[in-house]
């Protein structure tokens, strides 16, 4: 599971997800990519599930790049706890993604294999996304 080695602060505010992604929205490494169409928090488990699905489908052929990293801690309060007495403890990590962000890139396989592998990974994600091909 992906998570930061260390952070300056244990807990963070939730924040807002306005606008579009201004960085990380172009294909940089591979030939095919999965691009997000909605804003969301994507958990480390979802990122790993998508990566595994793509790797398995491609039968370890080609190369896969994960373009996002979960660096935001999400806190959860214990069940049946009264209000007050501080913020809950960090439970899992999420990556904040805005529309236009590239999640995965892939190369070294045919387009049909890449399209199928990326669609399987897209089904693991909690949001709508689209397949991109690098125009040469």
Swiss-Prot record:
For this record, the Gene Ontology CC terms, alphabetical, are: chloroplast; mitochondrial large ribosomal subunit
Where in or outside the cell is it found?
Plastid, Chloroplast
Q: What is its main location?
A: plastid
- GO biological process terms, semicolon-separated: mitochondrial translation
Annotated S-S bridges: none
Give the matching InterPro entries: Ribosomal_uL16, Ribosomal_uL16_bact-type, Ribosomal_uL16_CS, Ribosomal_uL16_dom, Ribosomal_uL16_sf
Coiled-coil regions, chain positions: none
Organism domain of life? Eukaryota
- Provide the GO MF annotations for this entry: rRNA binding; structural constituent of ribosome
Any idea which UniProt keywords this protein has? Chloroplast, Plastid, Ribonucleoprotein, Ribosomal protein
Q: Which family does it belong to?
A: Belongs to the universal ribosomal protein uL16 family.
On subunit structure and binding partners, the annotation says: Part of the 50S ribosomal subunit.
The protein's name is: Large ribosomal subunit protein uL16c
Record the organism. Answer: Saccharum officinarum
């Amino acid at each position: 599971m992906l998570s930061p080695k260390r952070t300056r602060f244990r807990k963070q505010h939730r924040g807002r997800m306005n606008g579009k992604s201004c960085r990380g929205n172009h294909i940089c490494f591979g030939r095919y990519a999965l691009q997000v169409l909605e804003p969301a928090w994507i958990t480390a488990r979802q990122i790993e599930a998508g990566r595994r699905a793509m790797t398995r489908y491609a039968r370890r052929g080609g190369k896969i790049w994960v373009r996002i990293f979960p660096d935001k801690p999400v806190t959860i309060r214990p069940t049946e706890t009264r209000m007050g007495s501080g913020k809950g403890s960090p439970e899992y990590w999420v990556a904040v993604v805005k529309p236009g962000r590239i999640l995965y890139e892939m190369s070294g396989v045919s387009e049909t294999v890449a399209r199928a592998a990326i669609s399987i990974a897209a089904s693991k994600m909690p949001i709508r996304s689209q397949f991109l091909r690098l125009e040469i």
